[in-house]
Amino acid sequence: MKRREFITLLGGAAVWPLAARAQQSGKLPTIGFLGGATASAWSNWSAAFVHRFRELGWSEGRTVLIEYRWADGRHERAAEIAAEFVRLKVDVILTSGGVLLAAKQATSTIPIVFAVANDPVGAGFVSSLARPGGNITGLSLQTTDLAAKRLELLREVVPGIRRLGVLANIGNAAAVPEIDEVQAAARILGLDVAMFEMRLPEDIASAFAAFKSGAEAIYVCTDPLVLAHRARINTLALAARLPTIYGPREHVEAGGLMSYGANFPDLFRRAADLVDKILRGAKPGDIPVEQPTKFDLVVNLTTAKALGIEVPPTLLARADEVIE
C-alpha cells in the first residue's frame, strides 16, 4: 500500500527554528515510516507515534511530512519500500526489528530509528547499546528472560505440559535469537519442542495440522508476518484446542490466550522522541539504544473459556489486563 499523508500536528513553537530552515530550503523534514505488517496491525503503534509527535510540537505543513508504507509481512516488499525511501531522500526512517535489516541494507547514511528490535548488537545493527555508532539507534528487547517467563506462564495455565509447539518465521533473520532463546528455555524446563518454521501465510494451516498431534500449547515468535495473520493463527489455535502465548498484546486482543512483553505503543512513543532528537540535529550513532523496563501480562478470559481452561487466580491477580 502506498499513500502520502500530511499529519495534522498541533503546537509548533518548539520547532520553529527547524520550520524556518524547512521554508528556506523549500523541503519539509520527511519521516519514512516503514511498517512491517499491515496498516491495521500497526494502527495502535502508529497512532502512539503520531500522538507523541504532537506533544513534541510538530505542525502539519510547516514542520513535518510522514510517508507511510506497509510491507504486509513480506520481506521483499520491505526492501522495495526502503529503496523507495532512499530515492525520496527522507530525513529519517522509522521501523521495527522485523524489517530493520531491509532499511539497514538500503542506506548507511539516512538515520534509522527502530521502535523495537531483538538484540540489535548481536544482530549487527549497532556497535553497542551505549554507543550505537553508524546511522541506527532505537529501542532494544532482549528475549532471554522474556522467553523463559512466557514458558513459565504457559506451565501455570497448562500444568504438566511436556510438548511445546513453536511457530516462527524462519525467513526473518530477526526471529532467530528468539527461536534460540525459546529452545534453550524449553530445555531447562524439560519440554520437548516441536518447531514449525513458516515462511508464507500458506504455511500457517500446515503448522497447526502438525501441532494437533505434537503439541499441548503454542509459543508464537514475534514477527510482522505473524502479526499480519494473527486472527487466522488464533482461529486455528482455538479449533485445535491449543493455548497460545505471544509477546505483543495485539495478538491477545485478536483472540490469543496470553501475551507477556513490552508495551509496543509505549515503545513507539519513545521512538518519536528519538526521531525528534535526530530532526533537531542529533546523530543517531551518538544516541544510546534504550531498553524498556516494564512488561505487561495480558490474558484473554474469553479465549480461556472457549478452550476449557481455568486460569489460576494467582495468575489473573498478576495480569496487567484481563480481556473478558
Where are these regions (language model features)?
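Short hydrophobic alpha-helices and adjacent helix-cap/hinge residues
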Residues: 1-324
